[in-house]
Amino acid sequence: MQNKRSFFVCNSSPTCRGRRILAIYYVKFYNEALDLHEVRRKTTDDFIIVYLSNDVSDFELELTWLKDHPQPYNLGECEFHLAFQAEDYEAAHKKHKEMGCICFENEAMGIYFIVDPDGYWLEIVP
């Protein structure tokens, strides 16, 4: 098995009751929006870590839920972000538009951003 590299996104949304429900909600978003699926999970009394990947890349996205974090994380100015290359850019754009998760489009550059349930911007490139 390849050694996969992980990206970390920490989720602390207080809007969902129960960490299990929250984990399902975030995993569902990333699966539907970016075709990432869960490859492994670590669950303790204090946190849940879920690793997402696809069958194309050797990268993993790490989602972490901290039980006792009292408020949403400060996302800064969103200058740091992840970019995902779409195999079918037009189909991806249509799907994201239907999902209502497009938060910014730059037609001149031929890119757009979607926003995850925590407010992280994810760039979509052709």
Where are these regions (language model features)?
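Short hydrophobic beta-strand elements that form part
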Residues: R17-G18, F84
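Core segments of cupin and vicinal oxygen chelate
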Residues: Q2, F8, G18-E60, F113
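Vicinal oxygen chelate
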Residues: M1-V9, T15-C16, R40, Y51, ...
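Exposed loop/turn and edge beta-strand positions of beta-sandwich/beta-sheet ligand-binding modules
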Residues: D46, C78, A108
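Eukaryotic phosphotyrosine signaling hubs
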Residues: S13-T15, E77-H81
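Short, charged/polar surface micro-motifs in flexible loops or helix N-caps
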Residues: D55-F59, D68-P70, D88-E90
